[in-house]
Amino acid sequence: MAFLKGKKMAELPVLEDAYIYIQSGRIAEVGLMKDLRMLPDISHIIDASRRIVIPGYVDCHTHLVFGTWRNEEFVDKIKGLSYQEIAARGGGILQSAARLGAMSEDQLYELAKSRLQQCIRNGTVGIEIKSGYGLSLESELKIMRVIKRLKLDSSI
C-alpha cells in the first residue's frame, strides 16, 4: 500500500475498470479487473460500470453533543465582530455551556443521535465524538455518557 504525502496529496488516484472485494462487511481487496483472480465467497456482485465508487468519510474531530447551534455567531464573525463582542452580546462558549448544562442527558442524547444519523446518511462511516463544551466536570461527564450511549446504539 502506498501512502501519499506532500504534493502527491493533491493528486487524486483513480482506478479505472477496477474491482472491490468485500468480505464480512469490510474491504478485503482492491485491484484492476485485468488482475482479478477467483475470489472465495462471492455471493453478490454489484456492477458499478460507468459509476464512481468513493470511500466513506471518517470524521476524526466532532463536537456532536451540544445544546444548540451557534449559527448567529458565525454570521457575526463574518460581519467582523470579535469573539469578545459576541460574548458581550450573550454568545460564545459560555452561552453554549450554559445551554448544555440546562439540558437533560436524554435531551442531549436525542439531539446528538439525530445529528449522528444525518452524518451517516451523508456518508460518514467512522466518527470520533469529542467533549469540551461542558466547561464543568458535571457537564463533561454528561457529555461522555451521551457519547457512550451513541456508541452503543450506533452502527459506526
Residue ranges and their predicted role:
Residues 1-39:
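N-terminal metal-binding scaffold of metallo-dependent hydrolase/deaminase domains
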Residues 15-17, 29, 52, 79-86, ...:
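Short low-complexity stretches enriched in small and charged residues
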Residues 20, 25, 50, 61, ...:
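Divalent metal-coordination and catalytic microenvironments
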Residues 40-42, 152-153:
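Short glycine/proline-enriched coil/turn segments at helix->beta-strand junctions
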Residues 69-77, 99-156:
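Active-site loop-helix segments enriched in His/Asp/Glu that coordinate
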